[in-house]
Amino acid sequence: IEQFDEMDTFIFLGTSYWDSDFQDLLKDSLTSNPRPFFVSNPDIVAPHKDFFSIEPGYFTLKLINEGINLPLWFGKPFSTIFEMALEKVQFITGSSINMSRIGMVGDTLHTDILGANSIGIKSILMTKYGLLRNQNIASCIKKTGIIPDYLIEGP
């Protein structure tokens, strides 16, 4: 816990090596000394070919449910990541961007499509890839109320 306690802030990027021991250390450290906690990936799970991985959103929700202060989110669907990307494109091109000409392609309604819709760019849902593959897409859209501008099968 000493290494955790030495940190001024935390950035939660991924869970490849994360386990319950690290989770307990982080919780104890943030409980005894609250400080900024950034989360770049609010996904709870991520689909892989043969399994689902548990992602930072899952562990962050556990912390919230255990009384840890709300984190600072900056991954999809939160606007910060989209604003950073748009600023980068404007910087590289040297011109302003017509938002109606930008599209976010993604495979998840709750992050990719919701984020694109909330920032005002076109949303393009891949239906045969990722979390929604083998799902009834129309039913998923109806259930969530998150409506993409376009549907494509995949890459």
How would you describe each model-predicted region?
Residues 1-155:
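Asp-based, Mg2+/Mn2+-dependent phosphohydrolase catalytic module
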